[in-house]
């Protein structure tokens, strides 16, 4: 995804995440520094302040693993971060980063079969290399919000809500 003159990428997911982080910061009455203190890995390691502030400024192509740390620190759901206030089904709030990867893989496979495309054709359609497509299809690797938004755009779906769409039947991993 390309940057504009201000260095921002036109990605509604980045905007939704930034909006949610700012809303939560204001609700809690925290400075950016204190907000960043909330974000720690399962091992207790702090998320870098720069990662947090660049995410708030929409200059960071944040990954699902980093978003999981943020969601945990704020006690929010993944869906809450990605949807930016848009209504999503209740089951979507139970998905973690691994479930999101599996849901994305299911959607890609569902759309590929619906369009009757070969794997290489689907990779071409969503604008990724075949090796990347294989990782997406297997729900392996750490996916970024720019990749998710690019896939949604290629499939002509709303980036903020397509992962939680009830129009696409749940896969094995969805609940």
Residue ranges and their predicted role:
Residues 33, 50, 79, 120, ...:
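Key DNA-contact positions within bacterial/archaeal DNA-binding proteins
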Residues 1-30, 88-114:
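A short, Lys/Arg-rich alpha-helix, primarily the initiator
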Residues 40-62, 127-143:
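Recognition helix of helix-turn-helix/homeodomain-like DNA-binding domains
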Residues 68, 73, 80-96, 161-175:
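Short amphipathic recognition helices of helix-turn-helix/homeodomain-type DNA-binding modules
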Residues 34-41, 121-123:
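Short alpha-helical "recognition helix" segments of helix-turn-helix
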Residues 63-80, 144-161:
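DNA major-groove recognition helix of helix-turn-helix/homeodomain DNA-binding modules
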Residues 26, 37, 72, 113, ...:
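Alpha-helical residues within the helix-turn-helix
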